[in-house]
Curated annotation (Swiss-Prot):
Belongs to the nematode receptor-like protein srb family. This is Serpentine receptor class beta-1. InterPro entries: 7TM_GPCR_serpentine_rcpt_Srb. GO terms for cellular component: membrane.
Length: 341
C-alpha cells in the first residue's frame, strides 16, 4: 500500500463513526480512571491490613493500572485532538518514533496487568501452606514475585517485537504492526489460556481454604491462629474478586482480539471495517475505571463483615477466676492511663 492509499485509509478510519466514538469513550474513561485509581491507591490499598507480601503485589498491580490509564489518556488524547487541526490526510499518520513509544508503553502495561494476577495465586498458595506462621514471614515473596513476573513479561515482549523496525505508516497506537501481528496473536492465546487457568486456580484456593479452615480450627483455637486464617480468607476473597473482574474485561478483550484476527478482512467486508474493528478499544479502559468501584465495594463489604464478626464472637468473660483477672486488668489499665494523664 503506497503512502497516498495509507493517508486515505487513515482518513477513512479516523472519521468512521464507530471508531471515533470508541476513541472518545477510551479517552473519557481513561481520564476519569487516572484520579480514581490514584485516590484508590492512597485511600484504600496502602492502608490495607493485609500481609506485606500480598499488599505489595496489590499496590504493584493497581500502580500498573494507574500508569496504564495515564498512557491511555495521553495516547487517545492525541487521537482526539490531532484530527481537529490537520491540514491534510497524511497528518493523521503517526510519526514512527512517537508510535514506537506509545505502542510499547501500552503493550507493556496491559500485559503487566494480565500477568501480575498469577503472583496472587502463587502467594495465596504459600500463605495457605504456612498458615500457622505466615504472619511472621518477612515481606520478601511479594516483591520477588513481582520482579520475576515483570522480567518474564519484558522477555516475552522482547521476543514479540525484536524484529520490528517500526518504519511503516501507523494510524493508531493500539494497532500491532503487520510484521509482528502473528507473534502477538500467539502471545494473546497464551495469555487467554493463562488467565482462565489462573481464575480456576483462585476458585480452588478458596474451596481448599474453606475446608482447611474448618478442620484446622478444631485443632488450633488460639486467637492468633484464628486471626491469621481469617486474614488469609479475606485477602484470598479480595484477590479473587479482582481476578474475576479482570478476566471479565481483559478476557473479553483478548477473546475479541483473537476472533477479529482469526476471521480477518473477509468477515468484515472491507479493509476499512476490519481496521476499525481492530482499533475499537473500550473494554480495557472501562475496566481501569470499573475496578475502582468494584474494589471499594468489596473492601467495604469485607470490613463490615469483619466488624460484625468481632462484635458477635469476641467476648471477655466476667465470671469466675478468669473474669476476676479480666476485671483487675481493666482496672489497672484505667489507673495507668489516669496516672499518665
Amino acid at each position: 500500500m503506497n503512502i497516498e492509499n495509507k493517508c486515505d485509509l487513515a482518513f477513512e478510519v479516523t472519521y468512521h463513526p464507530l471508531y471515533r466514538a470508541a476513541q472518545f469513550w477510551t479517552f473519557i474513561f481513561s481520564t476519569l480512571a487516572v484520579p480514581a485509581l490514584f485516590i484508590f491507591l492512597l485511600k484504600q490499598i496502602f492502608p490495607l491490613p493485609f500481609h506485606g507480601n500480598i499488599k505489595f503485589m496489590l499496590i504493584s498491580y493497581f500502580l500498573s493500572a494507574f500508569l496504564f490509564a495515564v498512557v491511555l489518556a495521553l495516547t487517545f488524547g492525541y487521537h482526539i485532538l490531532v484530527p481537529l487541526f490537520i491540514t491534510s490526510k497524511c497528518d493523521l499518520i503517526i510519526q514512527p518514533y512517537l508510535f514506537k513509544v506509545g505502542q510499547l508503553s501500552l503493550t507493556l502495561f496491559i500485559t503487566l496487568q494480565m500477568i501480575m494476577p498469577f503472583g496472587f495465586s502463587i502467594e495465596r498458595i504459600i500463605a495457605l501452606r504456612m498458615a500457622k506462621s505466615y504472619e511472621n514471614v518477612r515481606t520478601v515473596l511479594g516483591p520477588l514475585l513481582i520482579f520475576v513476573l515483570i522480567g518474564i513479561d519484558l522477555i516475552l515482549l522482547f521476543t514479540v517485537f525484536r524484529d520490528e523496525s517500526f518504519n511503516d505508516s501507523f494510524i493508531s497506537f493500539i494497532l500491532i504492526p503487520a510484521t509482528t501481528a502473528q507473534t502477538f496473536n500467539s502471545y494473546c492465546w497464551i495469555l487467554l489460556y493463562a488467565e482462565l487457568g489462573n481464575l480456576l486456580c483462585n476458585c480452588i484456593i478458596l474451596l481448599v481454604h474453606s475446608k482447611f479452615k474448618t478442620k484446622f480450627l478444631h485443632q488450633q483455637r488460639s486467637l492468633s491462629v484464628r486471626y491469621e486464617l481469617e486474614e488469609i480468607s479475606q485477602t484470598s476473597k479480595f484477590t479473587l474478586i479482582v481476578s474475576f473482574t479482570h478476566i471479565l474485561f481483559i478476557g473479553w478483550y483478548l477473546g475479541v482480539t483473537i476472533f477479529i484476527r482469526t476471521v480477518g478482512e473477509t468477515f468484515f467486508g472491507s479493509y476499512i471495517n476490519y481496521t476499525v474493528a481492530r482499533g475499537v478499544y473500550i473494554s480495557v479502559p472501562t475496566y481501569n475505571l470499573t475496578i475502582v468501584f468494584v474494589g471499594i465495594k468489596a473492601l467495604s463489604f469485607m470490613n463490615l463483615k469483619r466488624q460484625n464478626n468481632v462484635q458477635s464472637k469476641v467476648q471477655i468473660k466476667s465470671t469466675g477466676s478468669e473474669g476476676a483477672r479480666n476485671y483487675e486488668n481493666a482496672i489497672a489499665s484505667y489507673w495507668n492511663s489516669v496516672s499518665k494523664a
